[in-house]
From Swiss-Prot:
Keywords: Cytoplasm, Glycolysis, Lyase, Magnesium, Metal-binding, Secreted. It comes from Erwinia tasmaniensis (strain DSM 17950 / CFBP 7177 / CIP 109463 / NCPPB 4357 / Et1/99). This is Enolase. Binds a second Mg(2+) ion via substrate during catalysis. The active site is at E209, K342. It is an enzyme of class 4 (lyase). InterPro entries: Enolase, Enolase-like_C_sf, Enolase-like_N, Enolase_C, Enolase_CS, Enolase_N. It comes from the Bacteria. It catalyses: (2R)-2-phosphoglycerate = phosphoenolpyruvate + H2O. It is found in: Cytoplasm; Secreted; Cell surface.
Protein backbone atom coordinates (compact mmCIF):
# COMPACT_ATOMS: atom_id res chain seq x y z
CA UNK A 1 0.00 0.00 0.00
CA UNK A 2 3.00 2.35 0.24
CA UNK A 3 4.27 1.90 -3.32
CA UNK A 4 4.77 5.20 -5.18
CA UNK A 5 2.49 5.47 -8.21
CA UNK A 6 2.91 9.13 -9.19
CA UNK A 7 5.17 12.11 -8.47
CA UNK A 8 4.23 15.67 -9.42
CA UNK A 9 6.46 18.74 -9.19
CA UNK A 10 5.32 22.33 -9.51
CA UNK A 11 6.64 25.86 -9.12
CA UNK A 12 5.00 27.72 -6.23
CA UNK A 13 5.79 31.00 -4.45
CA UNK A 14 7.64 31.39 -1.15
CA UNK A 15 7.29 34.04 1.56
CA UNK A 16 9.61 36.44 -0.28
CA UNK A 17 7.63 36.19 -3.52
CA UNK A 18 10.28 33.98 -5.12
CA UNK A 19 9.54 30.64 -6.77
CA UNK A 20 10.25 27.36 -5.00
CA UNK A 21 9.64 23.68 -5.66
CA UNK A 22 6.61 21.81 -4.36
CA UNK A 23 6.28 18.05 -4.79
CA UNK A 24 3.36 15.67 -4.48
CA UNK A 25 3.98 11.96 -3.96
CA UNK A 26 1.00 9.63 -4.57
CA UNK A 27 0.91 6.06 -3.26
CA UNK A 28 -1.24 3.03 -3.91
CA UNK A 29 -4.38 3.28 -1.84
CA UNK A 30 -4.77 6.99 -2.56
CA UNK A 31 -2.31 8.31 0.05
CA UNK A 32 -0.66 11.63 -0.86
CA UNK A 33 2.24 13.62 0.58
CA UNK A 34 2.77 17.31 -0.25
CA UNK A 35 5.94 19.25 0.61
CA UNK A 36 7.78 22.42 -0.45
CA UNK A 37 11.46 23.35 -0.30
CA UNK A 38 12.45 26.49 1.66
CA UNK A 39 15.17 28.94 0.58
CA UNK A 40 17.88 30.86 2.44
CA UNK A 41 19.25 34.43 2.14
CA UNK A 42 22.49 34.17 4.13
CA UNK A 43 23.71 30.87 2.75
CA UNK A 44 26.81 28.85 3.58
CA UNK A 45 29.17 28.35 0.64
CA UNK A 46 29.14 24.57 1.18
CA UNK A 47 25.37 24.14 1.13
CA UNK A 48 23.79 21.76 -1.37
CA UNK A 49 22.86 23.68 -4.50
CA UNK A 50 19.47 25.29 -4.88
CA UNK A 51 18.86 25.07 -8.62
CA UNK A 52 17.55 28.28 -10.22
CA UNK A 53 16.86 28.81 -13.92
CA UNK A 54 18.91 31.98 -14.37
CA UNK A 55 16.50 33.25 -17.04
CA UNK A 56 16.37 36.98 -16.26
CA UNK A 57 13.16 37.43 -18.27
CA UNK A 58 11.28 35.28 -15.75
CA UNK A 59 11.13 35.86 -11.98
CA UNK A 60 14.39 37.89 -12.32
CA UNK A 61 16.28 34.67 -12.98
CA UNK A 62 14.95 32.89 -9.89
CA UNK A 63 12.54 30.51 -11.63
CA UNK A 64 12.76 26.81 -10.72
CA UNK A 65 11.39 25.17 -13.86
CA UNK A 66 14.63 23.14 -14.28
CA UNK A 67 14.27 21.71 -10.77
CA UNK A 68 10.56 21.07 -11.33
CA UNK A 69 11.47 19.38 -14.61
CA UNK A 70 13.81 17.07 -12.70
CA UNK A 71 10.97 16.15 -10.32
CA UNK A 72 8.51 15.45 -13.13
CA UNK A 73 11.09 13.67 -15.30
CA UNK A 74 14.05 11.61 -14.05
CA UNK A 75 13.18 11.68 -10.33
CA UNK A 76 9.56 10.61 -10.88
CA UNK A 77 10.71 7.85 -13.20
CA UNK A 78 13.31 6.57 -10.73
CA UNK A 79 11.13 6.44 -7.60
CA UNK A 80 7.83 5.28 -9.12
CA UNK A 81 7.15 1.71 -7.99
CA UNK A 82 9.40 2.08 -4.94
CA UNK A 83 8.24 1.78 -1.31
CA UNK A 84 7.82 5.25 0.23
CA UNK A 85 8.27 3.77 3.72
CA UNK A 86 11.89 2.99 2.84
CA UNK A 87 13.02 6.61 3.14
CA UNK A 88 16.73 5.80 3.01
CA UNK A 89 16.28 3.98 -0.30
CA UNK A 90 14.13 6.74 -1.85
CA UNK A 91 16.73 9.35 -0.91
CA UNK A 92 19.65 7.19 -2.08
CA UNK A 93 18.01 6.64 -5.48
CA UNK A 94 17.66 10.41 -6.00
CA UNK A 95 21.15 11.26 -4.69
CA UNK A 96 22.81 8.55 -6.82
CA UNK A 97 20.85 9.59 -9.90
CA UNK A 98 21.90 13.21 -9.39
CA UNK A 99 25.48 11.99 -9.04
CA UNK A 100 27.04 15.28 -7.91
CA UNK A 101 28.63 16.16 -4.58
CA UNK A 102 26.23 19.06 -3.95
CA UNK A 103 23.05 17.93 -5.79
CA UNK A 104 23.70 20.48 -8.53
CA UNK A 105 22.25 18.38 -11.37
CA UNK A 106 18.65 18.21 -10.12
CA UNK A 107 18.93 20.78 -7.31
CA UNK A 108 18.62 20.17 -3.58
CA UNK A 109 15.28 21.99 -3.84
CA UNK A 110 13.95 19.24 -6.16
CA UNK A 111 15.35 16.30 -4.20
CA UNK A 112 14.28 17.67 -0.81
CA UNK A 113 10.70 18.40 -1.88
CA UNK A 114 10.29 14.79 -3.08
CA UNK A 115 12.09 13.41 -0.01
CA UNK A 116 9.72 15.19 2.39
CA UNK A 117 6.62 14.50 0.30
CA UNK A 118 7.50 10.78 0.28
CA UNK A 119 7.83 10.83 4.09
CA UNK A 120 4.44 12.51 4.44
CA UNK A 121 2.82 10.02 2.07
CA UNK A 122 4.38 7.10 3.97
CA UNK A 123 3.11 8.49 7.29
CA UNK A 124 -0.39 8.72 5.79
CA UNK A 125 -0.15 5.12 4.53
CA UNK A 126 0.90 3.98 8.02
CA UNK A 127 -2.03 5.91 9.51
CA UNK A 128 0.19 7.98 11.77
CA UNK A 129 1.21 11.63 12.15
CA UNK A 130 4.42 12.71 10.43
CA UNK A 131 6.29 13.24 13.73
CA UNK A 132 5.60 9.63 14.69
CA UNK A 133 6.86 8.33 11.34
CA UNK A 134 9.98 10.52 11.67
CA UNK A 135 10.65 9.08 15.15
CA UNK A 136 10.53 5.59 13.61
CA UNK A 137 12.86 6.60 10.76
CA UNK A 138 15.15 8.10 13.40
CA UNK A 139 15.33 4.78 15.28
CA UNK A 140 13.67 6.39 18.31
CA UNK A 141 10.02 5.24 18.04
CA UNK A 142 7.71 6.84 20.59
CA UNK A 143 10.39 9.24 21.91
CA UNK A 144 9.24 12.83 21.60
CA UNK A 145 9.81 16.24 23.14
CA UNK A 146 8.47 19.73 22.49
CA UNK A 147 11.21 22.13 21.37
CA UNK A 148 12.18 25.35 23.12
CA UNK A 149 11.57 28.12 20.55
CA UNK A 150 14.15 30.75 19.69
CA UNK A 151 11.93 33.61 18.52
CA UNK A 152 13.57 36.09 16.21
CA UNK A 153 11.94 39.36 17.27
CA UNK A 154 14.53 41.79 15.87
CA UNK A 155 15.80 41.10 12.34
CA UNK A 156 19.01 42.58 10.95
CA UNK A 157 21.73 41.58 8.50
CA UNK A 158 20.54 39.89 5.30
CA UNK A 159 17.00 39.52 6.69
CA UNK A 160 16.20 43.22 6.90
CA UNK A 161 16.82 46.53 5.21
CA UNK A 162 18.30 48.26 8.26
CA UNK A 163 21.67 49.15 9.78
CA UNK A 164 21.86 46.27 12.29
CA UNK A 165 24.76 43.87 11.60
CA UNK A 166 23.74 40.91 13.72
CA UNK A 167 21.09 39.03 11.79
CA UNK A 168 18.84 37.73 14.54
CA UNK A 169 18.08 38.75 18.11
CA UNK A 170 15.94 36.05 19.69
CA UNK A 171 14.04 35.39 22.89
CA UNK A 172 13.62 31.96 24.47
CA UNK A 173 10.62 31.69 26.84
CA UNK A 174 12.43 29.36 29.26
CA UNK A 175 10.03 30.05 32.12
CA UNK A 176 7.17 28.38 30.23
CA UNK A 177 5.92 24.97 31.32
CA UNK A 178 4.56 24.05 27.88
CA UNK A 179 5.16 24.94 24.24
CA UNK A 180 1.77 26.62 24.09
CA UNK A 181 2.67 28.83 27.05
CA UNK A 182 6.04 29.62 25.42
CA UNK A 183 4.20 30.83 22.31
CA UNK A 184 1.93 33.04 24.44
CA UNK A 185 4.90 34.56 26.29
CA UNK A 186 6.68 35.17 22.98
CA UNK A 187 3.61 36.86 21.55
CA UNK A 188 3.25 39.14 24.58
CA UNK A 189 6.90 40.22 24.41
CA UNK A 190 6.61 40.75 20.63
CA UNK A 191 3.64 43.11 21.05
CA UNK A 192 5.31 44.96 23.91
CA UNK A 193 8.41 45.38 21.76
CA UNK A 194 6.25 47.17 19.16
CA UNK A 195 5.12 49.59 21.87
CA UNK A 196 8.70 50.18 23.03
CA UNK A 197 9.91 50.85 19.47
CA UNK A 198 6.98 53.18 18.72
CA UNK A 199 7.63 55.12 21.93
CA UNK A 200 11.18 55.78 20.66
CA UNK A 201 9.97 56.81 17.20
CA UNK A 202 11.41 53.66 15.64
CA UNK A 203 10.03 51.57 12.79
CA UNK A 204 7.86 48.53 13.45
CA UNK A 205 8.19 47.24 9.88
CA UNK A 206 9.05 43.54 9.88
CA UNK A 207 11.86 41.60 8.18
CA UNK A 208 11.83 38.27 6.35
CA UNK A 209 11.30 36.25 9.51
CA UNK A 210 8.56 38.39 11.04
CA UNK A 211 10.70 40.27 13.56
CA UNK A 212 10.90 44.06 13.71
CA UNK A 213 13.62 45.70 11.65
CA UNK A 214 14.32 49.15 13.15
CA UNK A 215 17.44 51.22 12.60
CA UNK A 216 19.35 51.23 15.89
CA UNK A 217 22.34 53.06 17.29
CA UNK A 218 24.29 49.85 17.87
CA UNK A 219 23.87 46.08 18.02
CA UNK A 220 23.70 46.29 21.83
CA UNK A 221 20.70 48.63 21.50
CA UNK A 222 18.73 45.73 20.00
CA UNK A 223 19.29 43.81 23.24
CA UNK A 224 18.39 46.88 25.30
CA UNK A 225 15.00 47.40 23.60
CA UNK A 226 14.23 43.68 23.93
CA UNK A 227 15.08 43.86 27.65
CA UNK A 228 12.67 46.80 27.95
CA UNK A 229 9.94 44.84 26.15
CA UNK A 230 10.42 41.79 28.38
CA UNK A 231 9.99 43.97 31.46
CA UNK A 232 6.96 45.75 29.98
CA UNK A 233 5.36 42.35 29.31
CA UNK A 234 5.73 41.50 33.00
CA UNK A 235 8.55 38.97 32.68
CA UNK A 236 12.02 38.76 34.17
CA UNK A 237 15.00 38.59 31.84
CA UNK A 238 17.28 35.68 32.76
CA UNK A 239 14.51 33.87 34.64
CA UNK A 240 11.44 33.75 32.39
CA UNK A 241 13.24 34.64 29.19
CA UNK A 242 16.79 34.16 27.94
CA UNK A 243 18.34 35.62 24.79
CA UNK A 244 20.03 34.17 21.72
CA UNK A 245 21.73 35.70 18.69
CA UNK A 246 22.57 34.66 15.16
CA UNK A 247 25.50 36.81 14.08
CA UNK A 248 25.67 35.34 10.54
CA UNK A 249 29.20 36.74 10.75
CA UNK A 250 30.18 35.55 7.26
CA UNK A 251 28.00 38.39 5.96
CA UNK A 252 30.23 41.09 7.50
CA UNK A 253 33.60 39.31 7.20
CA UNK A 254 35.80 41.34 4.86
CA UNK A 255 39.51 40.81 4.17
CA UNK A 256 40.06 38.79 7.33
CA UNK A 257 38.24 41.27 9.60
CA UNK A 258 34.72 41.55 11.02
CA UNK A 259 33.46 44.99 9.95
CA UNK A 260 30.40 46.21 11.84
CA UNK A 261 28.50 49.07 10.19
CA UNK A 262 26.34 49.44 13.32
CA UNK A 263 29.48 50.08 15.39
CA UNK A 264 30.76 52.89 13.15
CA UNK A 265 32.43 50.52 10.64
CA UNK A 266 34.77 49.24 13.32
CA UNK A 267 36.90 46.26 12.20
CA UNK A 268 37.52 43.38 14.62
CA UNK A 269 39.91 40.42 14.51
CA UNK A 270 38.44 36.98 15.34
CA UNK A 271 39.68 37.29 18.93
CA UNK A 272 38.37 40.84 19.29
CA UNK A 273 34.95 39.92 17.93
CA UNK A 274 34.81 36.92 20.28
CA UNK A 275 35.44 39.30 23.20
CA UNK A 276 32.88 41.77 21.81
CA UNK A 277 30.34 38.92 22.00
CA UNK A 278 31.62 37.85 25.41
CA UNK A 279 31.01 41.38 26.71
CA UNK A 280 27.41 41.22 25.46
CA UNK A 281 26.90 37.90 27.30
CA UNK A 282 28.07 39.61 30.50
CA UNK A 283 25.56 42.44 30.07
CA UNK A 284 22.59 40.27 29.03
CA UNK A 285 21.50 36.65 29.62
CA UNK A 286 22.56 35.43 26.16
CA UNK A 287 22.71 31.64 26.25
CA UNK A 288 23.19 30.83 22.56
CA UNK A 289 25.23 32.41 19.74
CA UNK A 290 25.05 31.12 16.18
CA UNK A 291 27.72 31.63 13.52
CA UNK A 292 29.74 33.92 15.76
CA UNK A 293 32.53 33.97 13.15
CA UNK A 294 32.96 33.40 9.41
CA UNK A 295 32.33 29.85 8.16
CA UNK A 296 35.98 29.55 7.01
CA UNK A 297 37.52 30.96 10.21
CA UNK A 298 38.10 27.62 11.94
CA UNK A 299 41.08 28.88 13.97
CA UNK A 300 38.89 31.73 15.20
CA UNK A 301 36.10 29.26 16.04
CA UNK A 302 38.54 27.12 18.03
CA UNK A 303 39.42 30.24 20.06
CA UNK A 304 35.75 31.24 20.43
CA UNK A 305 34.86 27.73 21.61
CA UNK A 306 37.69 27.86 24.16
CA UNK A 307 36.53 31.25 25.48
CA UNK A 308 32.75 30.75 25.41
CA UNK A 309 32.06 27.07 24.77
CA UNK A 310 31.72 25.96 28.39
CA UNK A 311 29.40 28.88 29.24
CA UNK A 312 26.99 29.11 26.31
CA UNK A 313 25.72 27.25 23.27
CA UNK A 314 27.74 27.95 20.11
CA UNK A 315 25.71 26.94 17.08
CA UNK A 316 27.23 26.18 13.68
CA UNK A 317 24.99 27.04 10.72
CA UNK A 318 27.04 28.28 7.73
CA UNK A 319 29.87 26.58 9.62
CA UNK A 320 28.44 23.03 9.34
CA UNK A 321 25.61 23.34 6.73
CA UNK A 322 23.82 20.22 8.09
CA UNK A 323 26.62 18.15 6.51
CA UNK A 324 27.93 15.13 8.43
CA UNK A 325 31.40 15.29 6.81
CA UNK A 326 31.90 18.89 7.91
CA UNK A 327 30.25 18.30 11.30
CA UNK A 328 32.55 15.34 12.00
CA UNK A 329 35.57 17.53 11.30
CA UNK A 330 34.16 20.15 13.68
CA UNK A 331 33.54 17.57 16.41
CA UNK A 332 37.06 16.14 16.00
CA UNK A 333 38.58 19.63 16.28
CA UNK A 334 36.33 20.77 19.15
CA UNK A 335 34.69 23.53 17.10
CA UNK A 336 31.38 24.92 18.50
CA UNK A 337 29.06 22.66 20.53
CA UNK A 338 25.80 22.72 18.58
CA UNK A 339 24.56 22.43 15.01
CA UNK A 340 21.76 24.25 13.24
CA UNK A 341 19.66 21.83 11.18
CA UNK A 342 18.23 23.10 7.89
CA UNK A 343 17.24 20.26 5.66
CA UNK A 344 17.61 22.21 2.44
CA UNK A 345 21.31 22.76 3.23
CA UNK A 346 21.88 19.03 2.67
CA UNK A 347 18.81 18.19 0.56
CA UNK A 348 17.19 15.04 1.95
CA UNK A 349 15.44 13.80 5.09
CA UNK A 350 17.80 10.82 5.51
CA UNK A 351 20.92 13.00 5.54
CA UNK A 352 19.21 15.45 7.90
CA UNK A 353 18.46 12.68 10.41
CA UNK A 354 22.09 11.50 10.13
CA UNK A 355 23.36 14.99 11.04
CA UNK A 356 21.06 15.20 14.08
CA UNK A 357 22.19 11.76 15.26
CA UNK A 358 25.89 12.54 14.79
CA UNK A 359 25.52 15.78 16.77
CA UNK A 360 23.66 14.13 19.64
CA UNK A 361 26.09 11.19 19.80
CA UNK A 362 28.95 13.69 20.18
CA UNK A 363 27.20 15.65 22.94
CA UNK A 364 26.36 18.54 20.62
CA UNK A 365 22.84 19.95 20.59
CA UNK A 366 20.77 20.20 17.40
CA UNK A 367 18.57 23.23 16.69
CA UNK A 368 15.93 22.67 14.00
CA UNK A 369 15.56 25.71 11.76
CA UNK A 370 13.45 27.36 9.09
CA UNK A 371 14.94 29.46 6.27
CA UNK A 372 14.27 33.12 5.60
CA UNK A 373 12.32 32.11 2.48
CA UNK A 374 9.54 29.82 3.73
CA UNK A 375 6.12 28.49 2.74
CA UNK A 376 3.10 27.25 4.67
CA UNK A 377 4.86 23.84 4.88
CA UNK A 378 5.32 23.07 8.59
CA UNK A 379 7.44 19.89 8.33
CA UNK A 380 10.16 21.29 10.60
CA UNK A 381 7.68 21.24 13.52
CA UNK A 382 7.24 17.48 13.07
CA UNK A 383 11.00 17.06 12.60
CA UNK A 384 11.74 18.83 15.90
CA UNK A 385 9.23 16.71 17.85
CA UNK A 386 9.96 13.42 16.06
CA UNK A 387 13.72 13.63 16.69
CA UNK A 388 13.27 15.12 20.20
CA UNK A 389 15.80 17.72 19.04
CA UNK A 390 14.86 20.08 21.88
CA UNK A 391 15.14 23.46 20.16
CA UNK A 392 13.56 25.18 17.15
CA UNK A 393 14.11 28.44 15.28
CA UNK A 394 11.10 29.40 13.23
CA UNK A 395 10.90 33.16 13.34
CA UNK A 396 8.78 35.69 15.14
CA UNK A 397 5.13 36.08 16.03
CA UNK A 398 4.02 37.49 12.69
CA UNK A 399 3.88 36.27 9.06
CA UNK A 400 1.84 33.14 8.52
CA UNK A 401 4.85 31.36 6.99
CA UNK A 402 6.41 31.51 10.50
CA UNK A 403 3.27 31.11 12.58
CA UNK A 404 2.30 27.95 10.62
CA UNK A 405 5.11 26.11 12.42
CA UNK A 406 4.10 27.33 15.90
CA UNK A 407 0.49 26.35 15.22
CA UNK A 408 1.56 22.87 14.14
CA UNK A 409 3.62 22.54 17.35
CA UNK A 410 0.57 23.56 19.40
CA UNK A 411 -1.49 20.84 17.66
CA UNK A 412 1.22 18.22 18.20
CA UNK A 413 1.59 19.11 21.89
CA UNK A 414 -2.17 18.76 22.32
CA UNK A 415 -2.11 15.34 20.64
CA UNK A 416 0.87 13.98 22.58
CA UNK A 417 0.21 15.48 26.01
CA UNK A 418 2.78 14.32 28.57
CA UNK A 419 4.39 11.95 26.05
CA UNK A 420 6.24 15.02 24.73
CA UNK A 421 7.79 16.97 27.62
CA UNK A 422 8.77 20.63 27.26
CA UNK A 423 12.21 20.84 28.90
CA UNK A 424 12.91 24.55 28.42
CA UNK A 425 16.40 25.82 29.22
CA UNK A 426 17.70 22.29 29.96
CA UNK A 427 17.79 21.73 26.18
CA UNK A 428 20.40 24.48 25.65
CA UNK A 429 24.06 23.43 25.69
CA UNK A 430 25.93 24.77 28.71
CA UNK A 431 22.78 25.66 30.70
Amino acid sequence: MSKIVKVIGREIIDSRGNPTVEAEVHLEGGFVGLAAAPSGASTGSREALELRDGDKSRFLGKGVTKAVGAVNGPIAEAVTGKDAKDQANIDKIMIDLDGTENKSKFGANAILAVSLAAAKAAAAAKGMPLYEHIAELNGTPGKFSMPLPMMNIINGGEHADNNVDIQEFMIQPVGAKTLKEAVRIGSEVFHNLAKVLKSKGMSTAVGDEGGYAPNLGSNAEALAVIAEAVKAAGYELGKDITLAMDCAASEFYKDGKYVLAGEGNKAFTSEEFTHFLEDLTKQYPIVSIEDGLDESDWDGFAYQTKVLGDKIQLVGDDLFVTNTKILKEGIDKGIANSILIKFNQIGSLTETLAAIKMAKDAGYTAVISHRSGETEDATIADLAVGTAAGQIKTGSMSRSDRVAKYNQLIRIEEALGNRAPFNGLKEVKGQ
